[in-house]
A protein has these predicted regions:
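Generic enzyme active-site microenvironment
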Residues: 16, 34, 80-81
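Short, charged/polar surface micro-motifs in flexible loops or helix N-caps
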Residues: 217-219
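Class I S-adenosyl-L-methionine
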Residues: 22-30, 42-211, 215
């Protein structure tokens, strides 16, 4: 995460630290506290243990920071949180309501919405996420408007490095790879996305990549595959 963030935000001070150990005094003056926490405890792809998972409990570290900043008279005016859409319905909605209640107890007025990257970011990937925003000032909350959808103009065709140059060879299948014969036979079209579904290969004809997840780096089924120019 840090390796990606730093080149894109070279002027931003990045504190790489265990959130459990970060104290308010390490945080500069801020108007907006943007927080994310591991989605696996709430995700369909995970075991959905929610707050019973240590990673799910990291939400309460955000609450702790808010409390410490408030004690220092630097309480953020806005709280901005993001997670998988399934968090909204996790445990019959109790997880979301618990988080909403915790934020409201800190004085925040809450709005929430599920947005898809391909409809708002002009990125050809289906990535639905739940966004939760809390405002200290209720008047600001009432004036807030979610962004309008934008037309998707970027396509898989123009965002993927089809040459394969500069990409680690470990991400490529070859004749010695397991399931090579099946993949080679099924993946006939270049510049298209395929998914290996354990026993068959499906071509994704929507032109939009399915959600990329953290565990895809470990291989397995459902990982998007392409046939590059080589």
């Amino acid at each position: 995460c840090a390796k990606t963030f730093i080149p894109n935000h070279p002027k931003t001070k990045l504190l790489v630290e265990d959130i459990n150990k970060v104290k308010a005094k390490q945080v500069p003056f801020i108007d907006i506290l943007a927080g994310g926490f591991p989605c696996q405890p709430f995700s369909v792809a995970g075991h959905r243990k929610g707050f019973e998972d240590d990673r799910g409990g990291l939400f309460f570290q955000i609450i702790r920071l808010i409390e410490e900043l408030e004690q220092d008279k630097r309480k953020p005016k806005v709280i901005f949180l993001e997670n998988v859409k399934n968090m909204y319905t996790h445990d019959n909605g109790k997880t979301y309501l618990k988080m909403k209640s915790e934020l409201e107890q800190k004085g925040y007025h809450i709005v929430k919405k599920i947005l898809n990257t391909c409809e708002y970011g002009n990125i050809p990937q289906n990535r639905e996420r739940l966004y939760i925003i809390g405002f200290l000032d209720e008047n600001v909350k009432n004036r807030f408007k979610w962004p309008e959808k934008i037309k998707l103009t970027n396509t898989i065709e123009n965002v993927i490095n089809w040459s394969g140059e500069g990409i680690d060879k470990k991400y490529f299948y070859n004749e010695s790879s397991k399931c090579w014969d099946l993949l080679n036979e099924a993946m006939t079209q270049k510049h298209s996305i395929y998914q290996f579904r354990r026993v068959y290969v499906r071509e994704n004809k929507s032109g939009v990549c399915p959600t990329l997840t953290a565990n895809m780096g470990m291989g397995g089924h459902n990982v998007p595959l392409i046939r590059d120019d080589n």
